[in-house]
Structure formats: structure tokens, C-alpha cells
């Protein structure tokens, strides 16, 4: 064991010993009992499975806003209940390797997917030389693990894309979107668009939005003239589009779930923030524009776990699975300064966290990590404040008013990411590695070591 790893494990042991003692006291007062989780968290052995949960744009302000509104200031979300919590830095780099202090989702995702920092907009390629870098999903496949990706964005959006594609620019989502990726086209000898690469990689489970990208026609190569969806079917994929189809999907063949033309519709709605603020409002927790046949993120995550586990059992494999689950529209609603949409997506993501933790409770050889790719714009401010930008006043489940402000860009423009560090929390084998302040690229190492990927 390397000296730095041994030292971190010793520190983790001391922290957990103290935490376990504290839990023993607080449990009697009704607090959740995480003593056994705490003991398991310092395990340095191999994990059979890894479930990585990404709340896109879910900084501490976004978590606090969702907590305050849904469970109260003194309540706890599922993501608050992990035994080990740290923080990691999120910066990207310029082509020369110097820091770019505010990342986008492509560069941040590349960081944990490959262990390499890159420039904003690039998907799993180096910053200066634009060379493809092996991803954690590709390594997991090579080592015999089942793999999956579940998201509420288009499957070709940046965060899911970093796992199984390599393109110069994140906009190159389908065969018709390759203007910024001339060297990545199949005609130029490249691997093609993000959609084409995703199915060519034979990822076992792909569930999200983005049907419009997969409906585009392949322009070159073996599948020329087909849509990417038809290409996927040629490669053996079961293609499903709603809850019923997802429920009936079998584990014998890979699954491509295309649940929406674009991003999956959000769960909640309400008035967007406005210059000068809004009247106090309660969020509408059932979006009338979300089809009733659309599975929740938690339902999609549950099915993905079932499919991946069943595949490995049928193959009598000693290896388990790697699964990434993304709550993508926390970020998208932050960009739109829509607090109700944002809170609803955070709450939906938190239910997926509950699914992952419930699975890990029955399978303690599962490493579960939850984190964000970057911080975002929303801030809880005093009710009497008159901040610049866009504001909204909400009435929480506790019956209190809460003012949220968005001021990282001019009103009318998309609100911007922030360069802050973000939370990372974990349980299971190798979870101690998240303690302290780490780098986003360290998450790649944590997963690689947990699964013993070589």
C-alpha cells in the first residue's frame, strides 16, 4: 500500500472511530444509526460494484435549497446520510495546462472518467493534443464488469458522454452534429458522434433522453443510411421509450432507453425567478407537461441495477457492475433560474440516491459515491435583501418563506456555473478516499482501485 494511501486510511480510521462513538450516543435520541456504515466505510478492499451518482450543478447551495424546501432546515436528505463526506476541486485547464477556474460538464466529467484534466467542451480527450484517453467505463468493460449509464438529460449530453465517447467538442452529439469535430467523423477515420460511439461501445444499459440524436442518419461506415437507433438494434439493443417498455426489458440483451426527444421533462414546475422577485409561491410537484408514461430517475436506476446484476449472474461472473446515474436538470433549471424545477430535480435525484444506498445495504461490497460536477448560481439570501439579478420567494413545507437569488449573469441570459469545490460523499470499499479536500480526478483513482481495474 502506498505511503499516502496508508496515511489516509489511518486518518479515516481515527475519524470513523470517533464518528461511531458519536452515533452510538445520538442513535438513542432518534438519529439514523450509521455505525455499521461507518465501520464498512474504512474498508480498503475490493468492491464488486460501483454506483456513481452525479447531481449536475448540485453545489452546496442547491443541496441546502432542496433540503430546506422538502424536509426542513433540520431534516436530512438521503444524500446527507453517507458516513463519509469530503469535498473536491472542479477546475478545468486550458490547452497549455494552466487552470481554467470554472469548469463545464464536459471537462469535469472527463476528470473523473479518465483521471485527466481537459479543456471546457472536450469529451474524454487530452487538453493540448486532443488524444483519446481511456475511461473508467472502458476499463470496467475490459475487466469483465457490466456497465450502465442513466440520466435525465440526453444520453449524448456531456456527463453521460464522457463514459463511452471521445470527441473534440461536446456539441457533436449525433451524426448531423459533427461540425466542430471534423477529425472525429467516421469519414475521417474517427469514431463518429457521441450517439454512434455510445452504442458501438456496447454499454449494457443506456437510459435517458436524446431520441432526436439517435434518430439521425449515419453518414459513413458500416451503418451508413441507418439511423443510430437502427444501428443499435443491429448491435443487439432492445430499444424502449417509456415505463412499460423499460419494465419489460430483459437482461439477455443490452437496453437503450430513449425516454424523450430531448431532455427528460422535469418533475416540478413553478414561476421562474424574476428581476425584483416573485410573490411567495409553492411549487407544483406534478408537471403537466411530463408524460405519465415517463419513468422517474429512481425507477430507471432500479431497473438498471436489476439488469446489470442479472447479466452478471447469468454469466456466472465474479465481477459486478459499474453504473453512473445523473440528475442532469438540476443544472439546467439553475441555468434557467427556475427554483421549483431545480428543487424538484434535486428531490428526484435524492430518491435515486436512496435506491443506490438501499442496494448497498444488502450488498456491502458495493461502493456508492454521490457528488456533483460543478457548483452553480443559486443562493439563499435574506428575505429583506434586494439583490441584483433574478429572485424568487418560496413557501417551504415548514410554512416559512425562503428567498433564492440567481446573479451569475445578466437577466435574460443563461445563468453560469461557479468555480467552487463541491461535496463528495461515499460508503463501501475505498470510501475513505473521499475524505478531506481532493481533486476531481482523484475520483477516477478511487473507482479504479475499488474495482481493481488494470
Regions flagged by a language model, labelled:
Residues 115, 139, 143, 209, ...:
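Mid-sequence acidic-hydrophobic segments that form the walls
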Residues 144-146, 363:
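Secondary-structure transition into beta-strands, especially the periplasmic turns and strand N-termini
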Residues 48-62, 67, 128-144, 154:
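Active-site-adjacent structural elements in enzyme catalytic domains
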Residues 44-49, 58-63, 68-110, 156-454:
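A post-motif C-terminal structural segment
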Residues 1-31:
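Secretory targeting and sorting signals
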Residues 32-42:
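A short, compositionally biased domain-edge/stem linker segment
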Residues 92-128, 134, 138, 147-152, ...:
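Noncatalytic scaffold domains of N-terminal-nucleophile
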Amino acid at each position: 500500500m502506498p505511503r499516502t494511501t496508508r496515511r489516509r486510511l489511518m486518518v479515516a480510521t481515527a475519524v470513523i472511530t470517533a464518528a461511531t462513538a458519536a452515533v452510538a450516543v445520538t442513535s438513542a435520541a432518534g438519529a439514523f444509526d450509521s455505525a455499521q456504515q461507518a465501520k464498512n466505510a474504512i474498508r480498503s478492499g475490493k468492491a464488486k460494484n460501483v454506483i456513481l451518482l452525479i447531481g449536475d450543478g448540485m453545489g452546496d447551495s442547491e443541496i441546502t435549497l432542496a433540503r430546506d424546501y422538502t424536509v426542513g432546515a433540520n431534516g436530512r436528505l438521503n444524500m446527507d446520510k453517507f458516513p463519509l463526506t469530503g469535498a473536491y476541486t472542479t477546475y478545468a485547464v486550458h490547452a497549455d495546462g494552466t487552470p481554467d477556474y470554472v469548469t463545464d460538464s464536459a471537462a469535469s466529467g472527463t476528470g473523473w472518467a479518465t483521471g485527466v484534466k481537459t479543456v471546457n467542451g472536450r469529451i474524454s480527450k487530452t487538453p493540448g493534443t486532443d488524444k483519446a484517453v481511456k475511461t473508467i467505463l472502458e476499463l470496467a468493460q475490459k475487466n469483465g464488469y457490466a456497465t450502465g449509464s442513466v440520466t435525465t438529460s440526453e444520453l449524448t449530453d456531456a456527463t453521460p458522454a464522457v463514459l463511452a465517447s471521445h470527441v473534440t467538442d461536446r456539441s457533436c452529439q449525433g451524426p448531423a452534429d459533427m461540425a466542430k469535430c471534423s477529425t472525429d467523423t467516421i469519414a475521417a477515420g474517427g469514431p463518429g458522434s457521441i450517439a454512434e460511439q455510445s452504442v458501438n461501445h456496447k454499454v449494457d444499459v443506456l437510459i435517458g433522453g436524446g431520441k432526436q440524436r439517435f434518430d439521425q442518419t449515419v453518414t459513413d461506415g458500416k451503418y451508413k443510411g441507418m439511423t443510430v437507433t437502427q444501428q443499435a438494434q443491429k448491435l443487439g439493443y432492445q430499444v424502449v421509450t417509456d415505463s412499460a417498455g423499460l419494465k419489460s426489458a430483459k437482461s439477455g440483451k443490452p437496453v437503450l432507453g430513449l425516454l424523450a426527444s430531448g431532455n427528460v421533462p422535469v418533475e416540478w414546475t413553478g414561476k421562474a425567478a424574476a428581476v425584483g422577485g416573485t410573490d411567495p409561491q409553492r411549487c407544483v410537484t406534478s408537471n403537466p407537461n411530463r408524460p405519465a408514461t415517463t419513468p422517474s430517475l429512481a425507477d430507471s436506476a432500479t431497473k438498471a441495477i436489476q439488469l446489470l446484476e442479472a447479466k452478471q449472474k447469468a454469466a456466472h461472473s465474479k465481477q459486478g457492475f459499474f453504473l453512473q446515474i445523473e440528475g442532469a436538470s438540476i443544472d439546467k433549471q439553475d441555468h434557467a433560474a427556475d427554483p421549483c424545477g431545480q428543487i424538484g430535480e434535486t428531490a428526484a435525484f435524492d430518491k435515486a440516491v436512496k435506491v443506490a444506498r438501499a442496494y448497498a445495504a444488502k450488498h456491502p461490497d458495493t461502493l456508492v459515491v454521490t457528488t456533483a460536477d460543478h457548483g452553480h448560481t443559486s443562493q439563499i439570501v435574506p428575505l429583506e435583501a434586494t439583490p441584483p439579478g433574478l429572485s424568487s420567494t418560496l413557501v417551504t413545507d415548514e410554512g416559512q418563506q425562503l428567498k433564492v437569488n440567481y446573479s451569475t449573469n445578466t437577466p435574460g441570459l443563461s445563468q453560469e456555473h461557479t468555480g467552487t469545490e463541491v461535496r463528495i460523499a461515499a460508503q463501501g470499499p475505498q470510501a475513505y478516499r473521499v475524505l478531506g479536500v481532493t481533486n476531481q480526478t482523484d475520483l477516477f483513482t478511487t473507482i479504479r482501485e475499488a474495482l481493481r481495474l488494470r
